[in-house]
């Protein structure tokens, strides 16, 4: 996806450009991985394409070459990459994607050369149906026993056959308390209500993501984020279109930096991005992250092995490494996203565990939805969102 060392992040934190430069310095570009795989995808990709396999048998800790990781940017502590490289004596090459649709398009093009990818929940179901994922050898992932019960039977992959959970969180609204007051209402109205948004006209951002942003509009209107009713989707698209004049941008890259940099006052985005930005800028008292009372998206990002992964055993070993209790805690302490790793809880910073915006209480969680694969309606989400933005 990225050209050279350019990184287009979804979960960009204000560890920001320094971390991005450090990662870029120790990572290959997508071009380099494609070259290793034999070309830029499709049937003409070259003679050294990996042979697709539906399953593999590996020993715990076994490696069969380097690790090619395709992840969201700024979504893993660089020290974990270094520790994995040193412990197993393998190189790690990282590339980054900005959203699930870009991820899918890249993998569908063929011969990506990637081993482990980090798709969100609903995308696992889509890729599984298309035969793009390898069935995991759970014998090679003994730390799978650390996965919390809530994450052991998800609807998109009920038996954890094709994925392991990585991180989870929510998508909501962050506001400047200078604008919103000390006790801001938890509502999507900060974006969609013209009266609430009147004083912050031009200082609002929304994610440049069809399912997330259409989902926010759907919940504000009282519908499911997974609606397949054309009239409801059109109503949501119309609401977004009416909102565009109030927006500074549709942005999935810098929204948290823009907020803490006081260029915007309200931002739609991912929980952990905001918390990391507040922490890095020592601005916890200046901003609030809100899970809207109308309901919002709860998501879980996952680790999966591609069906044509060149190094499937190294891939399994990496997944097992991340599922280690202390490594899982290190990941959460760095990203500020909730961990699906039950064994990691004792090593996670207490302030994170106690924060209801990171680990929502039951009454809030009851109004959260996972984004699901809506089949043929996916195209409608994409097309209507594109029309609304224009």
Predicted regions and their residues:
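Sec-dependent bacterial lipoprotein signal peptides
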Residues: 1-24
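A ligand-binding cleft/hinge motif common to bilobed small-molecule-binding domains
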Residues: 123-126, 266-285
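Periplasmic-binding protein-like
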Residues: 146, 233-242, 248, 283-309
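Conserved C-terminal helix/tail region of periplasmic/extracytoplasmic solute-binding proteins
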Residues: 257, 362-390
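Mature extracytoplasmic/periplasmic domains
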Residues: 306-365
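A bilobed periplasmic-binding-protein/Venus flytrap-type ligand-binding module shared by bacterial periplasmic
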Residues: 172-179, 220-222, 299-314, 321, ...
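Extracytoplasmic ligand-binding site segments that recognize negatively charged/polar headgroups
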Residues: 68-71, 75-77, 102, 113, ...
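Early extracytoplasmic/lumenal segment of secretory-pathway proteins
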Residues: 26-28, 41, 46-126
């Amino acid at each position: 996806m990225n050209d050279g060392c350019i990184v287009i992040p979804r979960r960009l934190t204000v560890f920001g450009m320094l971390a991005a430069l450090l990662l870029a310095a120790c990572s290959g570009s997508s071009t380099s991985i494609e070259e290793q795989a034999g070309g830029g995808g499709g049937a003409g990709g070259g003679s050294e394409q990996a042979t697709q396999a539906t399953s593999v048998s590996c020993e715990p800790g076994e490696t069969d070459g380097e690790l090619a990781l395709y992840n969201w940017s700024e979504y893993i502590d660089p020290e974990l990459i270094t520790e994995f490289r040193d412990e197993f004596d393998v190189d790690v090459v990282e590339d980054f994607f900005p959203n699930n649709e870009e991820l899918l398009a890249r993998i569908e093009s063929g011969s990506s050369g990637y081993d482990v990818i980090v798709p969100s929940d609903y995308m696992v179901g889509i890729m599984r149906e298309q035969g793009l994922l390898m069935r995991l050898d759970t014998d090679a992932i003994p730390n799978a026993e650390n996965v919390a019960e809530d994450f052991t039977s998800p609807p998109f992959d009920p038996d954890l056959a094709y994925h392991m959970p990585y991180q989870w969180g929510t998508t909501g609204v962050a506001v400047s308390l200078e604008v919103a007051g000390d006790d801001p209402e938890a509502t999507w109205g900060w974006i969609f209500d013209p009266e609430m948004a009147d004083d912050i006209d031009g200082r609002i951002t929304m994610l440049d993501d069809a399912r997330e942003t259409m989902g926010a509009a759907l919940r504000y209107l009282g519908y499911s984020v997974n609606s397949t009713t054309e009239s409801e989707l059109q109503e949501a698209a119309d609401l977004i279109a009416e909102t565009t004049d109030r927006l500074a941008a549709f942005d999935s890259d810098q929204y948290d930096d823009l907020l803490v940099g006081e260029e915007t006052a309200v931002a739609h985005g991912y929980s952990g991005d905001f918390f990391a930005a507040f922490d890095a800028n020592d601005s916890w008292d200046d901003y609030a992250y809100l899970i809207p009372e109308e309901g919002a998206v709860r998501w879980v990002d996952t680790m999966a092995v591609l069906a044509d992964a060149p190094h499937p055993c190294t891939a399994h070993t990496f997944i097992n490494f991340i599922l280690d209790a202390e490594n899982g805690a290190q990941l959460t302490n760095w990203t500020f996203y909730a961990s699906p790793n039950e064994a990691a809880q004792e090593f996670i910073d207490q302030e994170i565990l106690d924060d209801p915006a990171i680990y929502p209480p039951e009454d809030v969680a009851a109004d959260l939805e996972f984004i699901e694969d809506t089949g043929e309606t996916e195209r409608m989400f994409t097309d209507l969102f594109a029309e609304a933005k224009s």
